[in-house]
Amino acid sequence: MKIVILAGGGGSRLFPLSRSCYPKQFLHIAGEKSLLVQTIERFLGLAEAKDIIIVTNKDYIYHVQAELKEAGAEYAHIITEPVGRNTAPAISLAMAYIKMQGAADSETVFISPADHLIKPVEEFRKTVVGAESLAKAGKIVTFGIVPDKPETGYGYIKTTDKISGNAYAVEAFKEKPDDKTAAEYVKAGCYYWNSGMFMFSLQTMEAELKAHAPEIYAVYSSGYEAMLTDFEKMPDISIDYAVAEKSARMALVPLTGIYWNDIGSWDAIAETFSDSTGNMYSGDIIAENCTNTMILGQERLIAGLDLQNLMVVDTPDVLLVAQKGKSQDVKQLVNKLKKEKRKEVDENRTMYRPWGSYTILAEGEGYKVKRITINPGAKLSLQLHYHRSEHWTVISGTGKLTLDDKEVFFREN
């Protein structure tokens, strides 16, 4: 089995913590490890590192390399999309790469987002292993989440008859519903949340792409290297729209007894980590008489008094305050900021580079103050400036500096 982890998304619903420069999958939201590291470790129990493929944006490649190292999966493969084109082109690119590596047409492929929370992991792995026979038999298996409440933030999948074991035939994929429709879906008992996870054989998905997504198949059939050149020719479309909603080969396996959360909104995070009063606090927080309120801070003290049904997310350069239940609308707010060309959509005060990171501490007309962290053994490129001067103060560590034609060693001032 090959594991394909889709790690190219921007996670705009978790703004301002998630930015396009450092999106959701790299955040340490659910514990000490990032969501991507947790995802990689989840699949290391199903496949070796050499059988894991990470599909990502070229701007994230160094982040992914660091995450793979942390997870002990340095031998996993990283492929980058030339441009963002949604999940159908990303999956087809991964398939072409797998074929280029010499995989047989019968090879099974598991597709997973990079940023979901799933536990217990062992039960999840057992479910995946049990469903592989369906994929080998020509089915495209999707994994449904048993809904425990009406939820308008997820798509739904309607099932019909049981086809084998605990697998069901799929009748239809449903868009994110309104409150009334979501309640009807839960009451009906045959609807599941769409987890975005799929499993299939290469030959099955090839046939379905050819039948239902000819524009994608035309580029895919040219091979991996040609796909990199022609990637932009493929439509911007999800695998759900391109194939799953049209295919007669779909089967759904419920993730029964397994906790799943796509951590797709601030409401989802608040619900997952709140205490018995509905409150969730992270950072230097002093709160009195607050109920059903989430406050996340990073650097400064945040004091809250008599707050109800609020979400407060504070970062060094952006403060988000929103009513609970409205976090699905954060994406609209981000789109407005994009139209206004606000740099905060893309940039953080701290920016990560292959050699380390830098944090902007202060800036104004004629000056900018940065804190630069260089990883052990890493180096910055040589630079030459005509219109500005740089002054370095070394806080910790030692290094070698090239200055004109001389090399000098430096340490703390």
At which residue positions do the language-model features occur?
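Conserved N-terminal catalytic core of the sugar/cofactor nucleotidyltransferase
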Residues: 2-5, 13-16, 20, 28-113, ...
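Residue-level signal for inorganic ion chemistry
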Residues: 26, 36, 94, 115, ...
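Left-handed beta-helix
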Residues: 202-393, 398-412
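Generic secondary-structure signature for well-ordered alpha-helical cores
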Residues: 31, 41, 45-48, 69, ...
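Short beta-strand segments
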Residues: 6-7, 55, 110-113, 142-146, ...
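A residue-level structural signature of the nucleotidyltransferase/glycosyltransferase Rossmann-like core
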Residues: 109, 190, 197-198, 261, ...
